[in-house]
Amino acid sequence: SGSCTVKTCWMRLPTFRTVGDFLKDRFDGASRVIYGNKGSNRASRVELHHLEPENPAHKPPSPVDLVYFEKSPNFCTYSGKTGTVGTAGRSCNSSSPALDGCELLCCGRGYRTRMQRVTERCNCTF
């Protein structure tokens, strides 16, 4: 009359929100780097190439930092080269602090406010 006990350890991923918040935090702190060359010492060939901060006053990135080589294109203006259409002429929400808000969407150029009355038919019964 023996018994068998099975123990199972489960590893769970964090919630999508937790992962998103973590990545957003890293993205906001990302730094531009250049591909550095330490020299041609054969003994240190493994460390021959490394990432250096573009600005020498900044500290080198750690293995968990997000880095980038090229600046993002200016999405505020039209560019046939990068395929960005710009934001001029788009509708925005003047009271929203989100992505559809005028402050962000208009890229600091200012905006014109327009009042519009919309009449729609509804099948309302009273």
Swiss-Prot record:
Keyword flag Chloroplast: no
Sugar-modified residues: N93, N123
Domain of life: Eukaryota
Subcellular location: Secreted, Extracellular space, Extracellular matrix; Secreted
GO cellular component: extracellular space
InterPro entries per the UniProt record, alphabetical: Wnt, Wnt1, Wnt_C
A matching Pfam family: wnt
Key words of the record: Developmental protein, Disulfide bond, Extracellular matrix, Glycoprotein, Lipoprotein, Secreted, Wnt signaling pathway
Post-translational changes noted in the entry: Palmitoleoylation is required for efficient binding to frizzled receptors. Palmitoleoylation is necessary for proper trafficking to cell surface. Depalmitoleoylated by NOTUM, leading to inhibit Wnt signaling pathway.
Disulphide bridges: C92-C107
Lipid moiety-binding region (O-palmitoleoyl serine): S1
TM spans (from-to): none
Keyword Cell wall biogenesis/degradation carried by entry: no
GO process annotations (BP): canonical Wnt signaling pathway; cell fate commitment; neuron differentiation
GO molecular function: cytokine activity; frizzled binding
Gene3D superfamilies linked: 3.30.2460.20
The family this protein is said to belong to: Belongs to the Wnt family.
PANTHER family per UniProt: PROTO-ONCOGENE WNT-1 (PTHR12027:SF91), WNT RELATED (PTHR12027)
Summary of the function given for this chain in its UniProt record: Ligand for members of the frizzled family of seven transmembrane receptors. Acts in the canonical Wnt signaling pathway by promoting beta-catenin-dependent transcriptional activation. Plays an essential role in the development of the embryonic brain and central nervous system (CNS). Has a role in osteoblast function, bone development and bone homeostasis.
Entry protein name: Protein Wnt-1
Species assigned in the record: Sceloporus occidentalis
The organism's taxonomic lineage, starting at the top: Eukaryota, Metazoa, Chordata, Craniata, Vertebrata
